[in-house]
Amino acid sequence: MSAFGLLILGLLTAVPPASCRQGLGNLQPWMQGLIAVAVFLVLVAIAFAVNHFWCQEEPEPAHMILTIGNKADGVLVGTDGRYSSVAASFRSSEHENAYENVPEEEGKVRSTPM
């Protein structure tokens, strides 16, 4: 591999240096702006793609079943592994799949005008 490196180094030293002052000409201002916008959009697209693939999170399940004894209750999202007494207070004593409408006191209900 060192012989290949020496060959490349010899070729680079044999080639005359390029001058930056010799060019094909300046671009028009509108062309420079167009190129700048295109480069910016490509960089933004790359940033979005990296963010999309790098920062993926597992979706939270919408509904889970927790079995206690022989009775299955729905578990609220975010209360995984913890007992939620909020859902238990809505259960009806007449039917296992029915819920009670518990009247709320007027002071405890928060509402905003639309």
Curated annotation (Swiss-Prot):
Keywords: Cell membrane, Membrane, Phosphoprotein, Transmembrane, Transmembrane helix. The keyword Cell membrane applies. The modification Phosphoserine is found at residue 85. It is found in: Apical cell membrane. Residues 95-114 are annotated as: Disordered. Residues 1-28 are extracellular. It is a single-pass membrane protein. Residues 52-114 are cytoplasmic. Auxiliary protein of electrogenic Na(+)-coupled sugar symporter SLC5A2/SGLT2 and SLC5A1/SGLT1. Essential for the transporter activity of SLC5A2/SGLT2 but not SLC5A1/SGLT1. Forms a heterodimer (via N-terminal transmembrane helix) with SLC5A2/SGLT2 (via TM13); this interaction enhances SLC5A2 transporter activity. Interacts with PDZK1. This is PDZK1-interacting protein 1. It comes from Pongo abelii. The lineage of its organism: Eukaryota, Metazoa, Chordata, Craniata, Vertebrata.
